[in-house]
Swiss-Prot record:
Family of this protein: Belongs to the transcriptional regulatory Fis family.
Organism, scientific name: Vibrio atlanticus (strain LGP32) (Vibrio splendidus (strain Mel32))
Residues annotated as signal peptide: none
Keyword Transcription regulation recorded: yes
Keywords recorded for this protein, A-Z: Activator, DNA-binding, Transcription, Transcription regulation
Molecular function per GO: DNA-binding transcription factor activity; sequence-specific DNA binding
InterPro entries attached to this UniProt entry: Fis_DNA-bd, Homeodomain-like_sf, HTH_Fis, Trans_regulatory_Fis
NCBIfam families to which the protein is assigned, alphabetical: PRK00430.1
DNA-binding annotation, residue ranges on this chain: 74-93
Name the UniProt record assigns to this protein: DNA-binding protein Fis
Purpose of the protein: Activates ribosomal RNA transcription. Plays a direct role in upstream activation of rRNA promoters.
Assembly: Homodimer.
Keyword Transcription regulation listed: yes
Classification of source organism: Bacteria, Pseudomonadati, Pseudomonadota, Gammaproteobacteria, Vibrionales
Length: 98
């Protein structure tokens, strides 16, 4: 049986500069830069539920993309994500994607 060995390095963000230069960097670098920017804009204000905010920003497009890729097959989507189907259904409902 074929075993797929993908690492997080496969998740990259590609950008094209005004000089048509193409760059790729790991998704985690973009997330880190976005968080630093967000925190810099707080100007000392207290923030709560940052963890949930970040998860929602990543989780919703992940679910949407995987559901499109699997053509709505929840069993296959759950397997791809490494979660059980019940958990997937709860997450889809949370984001109004059921």
């Amino acid at each position: 049986m074929f075993e797929q060995n993908l690492t997080s390095e496969a998740l990259t963000v590609t950008t094209v500069t005004s000089q048509d230069q193409i760059t790729q960097k790991p998704l985690r670098d973009s997330v880190k830069a976005s968080l630093k920017n967000y925190l810099a804009q707080l100007n000392g204000q207290e923030v709560s539920e940052l963890y949930e905010l970040v998860l929602a920003e990543v989780e919703q497009p992940l679910l949407d993309t995987i559901m499109q890729y699997t053509r709505g097959n929840q069993t296959r989507a759950a397997t791809m994500m490494g979660i059980n189907r019940g958990t997937l259904r709860k997450k889809l409902k949370k984001y109004g994607m059921n």
